[in-house]
């Protein structure tokens, strides 16, 4: 009796009988074009530590806040290279699919490639399987991709993403916004405090959010808190850029609800930033003096 060898389904992934993972685009690259994976761009350095902070732009700071019915991710725009400002308008927050977004901290070039590859990974999975990954599945996929960058991280070119998303399988839709952080070796951690931050200014951003945040806040309040946290981080961390009213450069943000992921408009970001700067200026000005 002859048995046909057909693809089988294992743990939500389509695999051929010889073990090739059809639903993973990064696995496909690893087998057929490994030189295009972000972590393999530095495979020929002979193990020499490169001092990534001085040879490649680094991006910080990213904050995430969950609110009633959703979650948001926001980031500043500055990238630094050693003691220099490498860029003032870097995009650090990316929509990765309809219900998730990722922010990047660490070596900017590798981090941006990794997040873009992650977005392709999610799209590829949905095309092959016919259904999107669950939020836990997305978090696990990103974890394995960060782990794959360990070689570059050991050379000083670390990537630390922050993942947020709306969990369509959540029992309580008002608490469906989820935040997952990672370490440089790919460990994933669910952040249940309702907020989190990564990057060089994360200590100051989290300290600000600790005083501001309360469960059940609405989206507009969460957006204001995120920009305030980035403002406070920029006040104490030279690698974090605050709102630049002169150049018209403001933090970027993505909000995610049951309706999907939406990028914050520049006009809205400018409005929030100007309100915060005006309020801080008025508070700091001596009584009777003009804030201007």
From Swiss-Prot:
Pathway of action: Protein degradation; proteasomal Pup-dependent pathway
Catalytic activity, reaction form: Cleavage of peptide bonds with very broad specificity
Residue ranges of the propeptide: 1-59
The Gene Ontology CC terms held by the record are:
cytoplasm; proteasome core complex, beta-subunit complex
A GO term for molecular function: endopeptidase activity
Gene Ontology annotations of biological process type: modification-dependent protein catabolic process; proteasomal protein catabolic process
For whether the record's keyword set contains Nuclease, the answer is no
Q: Name one Pfam family in it.
A: Proteasome
SUPFAM superfamilies on file:
N-terminal nucleophile aminohydrolases (Ntn hydrolases) (SSF56235)
What are the UniProt keywords, alphabetically? Autocatalytic cleavage, Cytoplasm, Hydrolase, Protease, Proteasome, Threonine protease, Zymogen
Tell me which EC number(s) this protein carries.
3.4.25.1
Broad enzyme group: hydrolase
Q: Where does the protein end up? A: Cytoplasm
Which InterPro entries does this entry report, sorted A to Z?
Ntn_hydrolases_N, Proteasome_sua/b, Proteasome_suB-type, PSB_actinobac
Q: How is its activity regulated?
A: The formation of the proteasomal ATPase ARC-20S proteasome complex, likely via the docking of the C-termini of ARC into the intersubunit pockets in the alpha-rings, may trigger opening of the gate for substrate entry. Interconversion between the open-gate and close-gate conformations leads to a dynamic regulation of the 20S proteasome proteolysis activity.
Instruction: Indicate the residues that form the catalytic site.
Output: 60 (nucleophile)
| Subunit description | The 20S proteasome core is composed of 14 alpha and 14 beta subunits that assemble into four stacked heptameric rings, resulting in a barrel-shaped structure. The two inner rings, each composed of seven catalytic beta subunits, are sandwiched by two outer rings, each composed of seven alpha subunits. All four combinations of alpha- and beta-subunits (beta2-alpha1, beta2-alpha2, beta1-alpha2 and beta1-alpha1) yield fully assembled and proteolytically active proteasomes. The catalytic chamber with the active sites is on the inside of the barrel.
Q: What family is this?
A: Belongs to the peptidase T1B family.
Q: Which HAMAP family match?
A: Proteasome_B_B
> What job does the chain carry out?
Component of the proteasome core, a large protease complex with broad specificity involved in protein degradation. The R.erythropolis proteasomes are able to cleave oligopeptides after Tyr, Phe and Leu, very poorly after Arg but not after Glu. Thus, displays chymotrypsin-like activity, low trypsin-like activity but no caspase-like activity.
- Name of protein: Proteasome subunit beta 2
Species annotation = Rhodococcus erythropolis
């Amino acid at each position: 009796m002859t048995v046909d060898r057909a693809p089988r389904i294992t743990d939500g992934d389509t695999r051929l009988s010889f073990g090739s993972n059809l639903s993973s685009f990064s696995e496909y690259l690893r087998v057929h074009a490994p030189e295009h994976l972000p972590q393999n761009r530095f495979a020929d350095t002979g193990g020499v530590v490169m001092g990534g902070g001085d040879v490649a732009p680094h991006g910080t700071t990213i904050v995430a806040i969950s609110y009633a019915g959703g979650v948001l991710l926001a980031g500043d725009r500055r990238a630094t290279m050693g003691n220099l400002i490498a860029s003032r308008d870097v995009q650090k927050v990316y929509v990765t699919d309809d219900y998730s977004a990722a922010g990047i901290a660490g070596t900017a070039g590798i981090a941006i490639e990794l997040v873009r590859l992650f977005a392709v990974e999610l799209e590829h999975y949905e095309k092959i399987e016919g259904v999107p990954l669950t939020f836990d599945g997305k978090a696990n996929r990103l974890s394995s991709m960060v782990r794959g960058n360990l070689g570059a991280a050991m050379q000083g070119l670390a990537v630390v993403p922050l993942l947020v998303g709306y969990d369509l399988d959540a029992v309580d839709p008002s608490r469906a916004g989820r935040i997952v952080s990672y370490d440089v070796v790919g460990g994933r951690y669910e952040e249940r405090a309702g907020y989190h931050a990564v990057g060089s200014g994360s200590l100051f951003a989290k300290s600000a959010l600790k005083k501001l945040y309360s469960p059940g806040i609405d989206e507009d309040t969460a957006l204001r808190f995120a920009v305030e946290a980035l403002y406070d981080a920029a006040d104490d961390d030279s690698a974090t850029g605050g709102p630049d009213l002169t150049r018209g450069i403001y933090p970027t943000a993505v909000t995610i609800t049951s309706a999907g992921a939406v990028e914050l408009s520049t006009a809205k970001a400018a409005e929030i930033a100007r309100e915060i700067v005006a309020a801080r200026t008025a508070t700091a000005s001596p009584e009777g003096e003009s804030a201007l």
